[in-house]
Curated annotation (Swiss-Prot):
Gene for this chain: Lca5
Name of the protein: Lebercilin
Originating organism: Mus musculus (Mouse)
Gene Ontology MF annotations: protein-containing complex binding
Chain intervals for the UniProt region annotation (Disordered): 1-80, 389-417, 476-661
Coiled-coil boundaries: 105-300, 448-479
Effect of disrupting the coding gene: Deficient mice exhibit retinal patches of depigmentation, lack rod and cone ERG responses to light stimuli, and show loss of ciliary intraflagellar transport function in photoreceptors leading to failure of outer segment formation and photoreceptor degeneration.
Composition skew (Low complexity), residue ranges: 25-40, 617-627
Family, per entry: Belongs to the LCA5 family.
Length: 704
């Protein structure tokens, strides 16, 4: 196609080229230079403009190209005819034109070549344009198809969420349908089971009815109905009883719980109160120890030791043999099991109190240790006043025998009262016994106010009795001729006052505890088992007959002052004490030769009184001088004798009462606690020992 378009142009150029040549040739002579250079100048801008604006040139070619291709064939002959006519005219006009020069030809040929080249380029560009148009059209169609597919894909992607939502809705609907179907299935299975159970029961009842219908030995229906009614009534009664019993059980359980709580509370309160009382007991024990120390310092009767005669010592040894059996009986009867006095693992310490002569004494006769301390100074003054008048008067032994006969009814009455007290104490429970043994009086009597009142009143009574007795002694000393009247009892009787209504509930009552507490574990001294001598001193051990017959009450009614003799504390020189003691004994031994027998009997009465007031140690000053008297009252009574338990080889040396008591510990008291805190006498002690200690002048009993 391009070749076809190119060929007419070439042909046209060739034809046109002939005419210009002819035209140029005709005008060559007139304007050869102007025409020559003008043509290249005109062609050059065209080429340059085409190169600068190829797009515009292409568009122009695209516009004018169809017109060139569609030139009718009729136009060609017209042009040819015109050209021919022009040619013919030029030939006719210039028949004799000269040939152009060579330069012009060359320029023209160059212009022609250039035109041909440009035409070739135009044709090539047109071909390329046609190809590009085809390609553009194909790309547009492809783009359209791609856009259509893309729109279709986007629509499908937007529908995915809706599709998922619809799918979820379908799943929910299917699950709901499945649940309903399962419920229906379960309901159906339940109905089937109920139906099967009903069928089974129906079959069972049918079989039972068949058996009943076949049974011939059954009673009538009315009897069976009555039995059924009675069985139902019994069942109802049984159920009602069960309910009542369960209710009663619940109520009883609640009441028992309340009672148990109350008992526990009471037990805790008792436990706390017991602890308080134990602390108070310890405090009193420490206070008592302090009082003992003070008494040890204030002792004033350490060196007044008499020397007993050999005849008296033999008599004491003979009585000691008879006392050993009774002492063994007391030890046997006084044993107390550990179960009776073990109280809450509390280690009770031994409490030091004054006890009376023997186990037949009334519990009211027990007095506290504090009374002794209060009356210590007063008793020492009375002792000095009585000893100053000791050698002036004398008295026969008849009043003493009359005095003993007057005291027998009182002793029997005391035994009856003691039996009553023992009978009452036997009825006490174990807890009350423990309370009586531990505190010696009920818990409420531990109050300080009542105890102080009782102690004050007891002190006042003791003082009155002591003053009355001293006045009586002074009267007897001033009136030695008045010997026929009956003597006063050595001490006033406390019985009526202690048994008065205001004294009926007083403490200090433990008649059995004295016998039971002698188990060898908490014993601190022997004298609480040894029946007292007169005056509440560490008295001698009586013979069995004397122990079974209680001593007169007046002999041991004064139990607050108990002087005795212990071991020396190193306050004085032992040799000087020995010499002074020997001098004192020699003077006392010479007294029978200087005084008459009446004076000896009166001195014996004084010694008995001093023994009652201050213990046997006070009256021992005249024992050695009067031991030869066969009618000696003290020998008949035997109250002071057991203090001088001397062996056969010790008759020649002087022994003090503390030594005799210590020997008694060594011989008879092997069951005692070996860890006693009392001072022991060595086996090789000197012949005469003067002591200042008061460790032995207080009788101790363990308060359990």
């Amino acid at each position: 196609m391009g070749e076809r378009a190119r060929s007419p142009d070439i042909e046209q150029g060739k034809k046109g080229g002939k005419h210009p040549y002819s035209h140029y040739s005709s005008d060559l002579g007139s304007s050869p230079q102007s025409s020559g250079p003008s043509s290249p100048v005109n062609t050059t801008p065209c080429a340059s403009t085409r190169e600068k604006n190829p797009k515009r040139h292409l568009s122009d070619n695209q516009v004018h190209h169809p017109t060139v291709r569609k030139v009718s064939p009729k136009a060609v002959p017209s042009k040819k005819g015109i050209r021919v006519g022009f040619r013919s005219q030029s030939l006719n006009r210039e028949p004799l034109r000269k040939d152009p020069d060579i330069v012009t030809k060359r320029v023209l040929s160059a212009r022609l070549l250039k035109i041909n080249e440009l035409q070739n380029e135009v044709s090539e560009l047109q071909v390329k344009l046609a190809q590009l148009l085809k390609e553009n059209k194909a790309l547009k169609s492809l783009q359209y198809r791609q856009e259509k597919a893309l729109n279709k894909f986007e629509d499908a992607e937007n529908e995915i969420s809706q599709l998922i939502h619809r799918h979820n809705n379908e799943i929910t609907a299917l699950k709901e349908r499945l649940r309903k179907s399962q419920e229906k299935e379960r309901a159906t299975e339940k109905r089937v089971k109920e139906t099967e159970g009903e069928l089974f029961r129906t079959k069972f009842s049918l079989q039972k009815l068949k058996k009943i219908s076949e049974a011939r030995h059954l009673p009538e229906r009315d009897d069976l109905a009555k039995k059924l009614v009675s069985a139902e009534l019994k069942l109802d009664d049984t159920e009602r009883k069960i309910k009542e019993l369960s209710k009663n059980l619940e109520l009883s359980t609640n009441s028992f719980q309340r009672q148990l709580l109350a008992e526990r509370k009471r037990a805790f309160e008792a436990y706390d109160e017991n602890k308080v009382l134990q602390k108070e007991l310890q405090r009193l024990h420490h206070k008592l120890k302090e009082k003992e120390k003070e008494l040890d310092i204030k002792n004033i009767y350490a060196n007044r030791l008499p020397k007993s005669s050999p005849k008296k010592e033999k008599e004491i040894e003979r009585k000691h043999v008879s006392c050993q059996s009774d002492f063994t009986d007391q030890c046997t009867k006084g044993v107390q099991t550990a179960e009776d006095f073990e109280l809450e693992d509390f280690p009770f310490t031994a409490q030091t109190v004054l006890c009376y002569e023997n186990r037949w004494d009334e519990p009211e006769y027990l007095s506290s240790y504090l009374e002794y301390q209060d009356l210590n100074k007063h008793g020492s003054e009375m002792l000095s006043s009585v000893l100053g008048q000791e050698g002036k008067y004398d008295e026969d032994e008849d009043p003493c025998s009359a005095k003993q006969e007057a005291r027998k009814p009182e002793s029997e009455w005391a035994r009856e009262e003691l039996d009553k007290v023992k009978g009452k104490s036997a009825l006490l429970g174990r807890a009350e016994k423990l309370a009586l043994e531990a505190g010696r009086f009920p818990t409420e009597n531990y109050q300080a106010q009542s105890v102080d009142k009782f102690e004050d009143e007891a002190e006042r009574l003791k003082t009155e009795m002591l003053l009355a007795k001293l006045n009586e002694i002074n009267k007897e000393l001033q009136d030695p001729q008045n010997l026929g009247r009956a003597p006063l009892p050595l001490l006033p009787n406390f019985e009526s006052k202690l048994h008065s209504p205001d004294r009926s509930t007083r403490p200090y009552s433990f008649p059995e505890s004295l016998d039971r507490s002698f188990n060898g574990q908490h014993l601190q001294d022997l004298s609480f088992l040894t029946p007292r001598g007169e005056g509440g001193s560490p008295g001698p051990i009586r013979s069995p007959g004397q122990i079974r017959s209680p001593a007169p009450l007046d002999e041991f009614s004064f139990g607050s002052y108990v002087p005795s003799f212990g071991k020396t504390l190193g306050k004085s020189n032992p040799p000087s004490q020995k010499s002074s003691l020997l001098d004192f004994q020699s003077n006392s031994s010479e007294s029978p030769s200087k005084d008459s027998l009446d004076l000896m009997s009166r001195k014996e009465k004084k010694a008995t009184l001093m023994e009652q007031l201050f213990g046997p140690s006070a009256s021992n000053t005249s024992v050695s001088s009067k031991s030869t008297d066969p009618h000696f009252p003290a020998a008949s009574r035997g109250d002071m004798d057991p203090l001088h338990f001397l062996s056969g080889d010790r008759n020649s040396r002087v022994r003090e009462p503390g030594d005799e008591e210590e020997d008694l510990f060594l011989r008879e008291g092997r069951s005692f606690n070996p860890n006693r805190h009392r001072l022991k006498h060595a086996s090789n002690k000197p012949t005469v020992t003067a002591v200042d200690s008061v460790d032995e002048d207080i009788e101790e009993v363990t308060l359990r």
